[in-house]
């Protein structure tokens, strides 16, 4: 019976230390590390979300310029000419908005007040599902005429168009200010000389 007393005393002596250790919880350093990790993950999530949204906006433009290309080819097959709808591939010439930004979308189908003389977008067999964010331009010419503009730039690469095209031609452009805090704009191009779509995105 006497032999059991020291053993019980030893257990009793250790118990407060164990309880005190559990009660202490995380240290300040450990909490700071957790906060930093959460902050980093939050930043990565926001950046990833913004990139995803931007890519979805650009996909609207790439799909639309391809649709305009198909509509131009259908129009040419019927009339033997491409539709020279826009006054140019230039700022202020786009439709349905002359100053498109990511802050709003604009309905397609309204009368084009800044189109080339006598032309309207409704002349193209083009189906648009709803309002669009980008503004769109398309210019065209006959064989032997020079492309206007003669070239465009996409992410540092210069794309040069023929000075005297051997065939009838067209150029399609989409433009939008996706980041309204800077003057840089995003452009998407295609043309009758290539099936490629070029994206010039400053981000």
Placement of each model-derived feature along the sequence:
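N-terminal leader/signal peptides at the extreme start of proteins
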Residues: 1-26
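Periplasmic/extracellular, small/polar-rich flexible segments of pilin-like filament-forming proteins
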Residues: 2-3, 78-203
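Alpha-helix exit/C-cap motif
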Residues: 50-56, 69-88
